[in-house]
Amino acid sequence: IARKNAKNDCLFRFRCAYQPGTLEAVAYNAAGQETGRCAMTTAGPATELRAEPEEAVLRPGQLCYIRLRYTDQNGVLKPTVREPIRVQVTGGRLLALGNACPFNLQGYRTSHTDPYWGEAMAIVEAGTEGCVTLQADSTVGSAVAAVQVHKE
């Protein structure tokens, strides 16, 4: 779209007409060398619920953080989707479920939450050997995260 030099507030504003696609910002240092790059892509029309564990394998009693996200079919986050999410855990114990909203009246000790900007997080404690499974359901769809539990 254009280039601008940094000012004291490090805020850059550009006026442009909206069109779907990818918008990319590129940062350069004083010598003109690229120092950073960030892109945003328009989400597609379809919406799905995803459950993404941070770990692939756990030890008994270990905590697993499972990210719940509303995305399009390509995994692009859909931050305006606010459908409530309900979870059920087997092979472990749900310790907390919630979002990053600074004003959360529901608390974090329930099996349901509203997403904040399209996302929520579940914290699960692994049980004994086997598999810990989180089933997430909403009006949009369902998602499952399964993580193996092994004694070392």
Language-model segment annotations:
Residues 18-22, 63, 129-131:
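Extracellular Ig-like/FN3 beta-sandwich strand-entry sites
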Residues 26-27, 61-79, 85, 134-136:
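Beta-strand-rich structural segments
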Residues 12-18, 108-128:
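Short, hydrophobic beta-strand segments
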Residues 46-50, 88-104:
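Short aromatic-acidic-glycine turn motif
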Residues 40-61, 151-152:
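Low-complexity, Pro/Ser/Thr- and charge-rich linker/hinge segments at domain boundaries
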Residues 2-8:
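Short beta-strand segments within Ig-like beta-sandwich modules, predominantly Fibronectin type-III
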Residues 32-44, 142-151:
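Edge beta-strands of extracellular beta-sandwich domains
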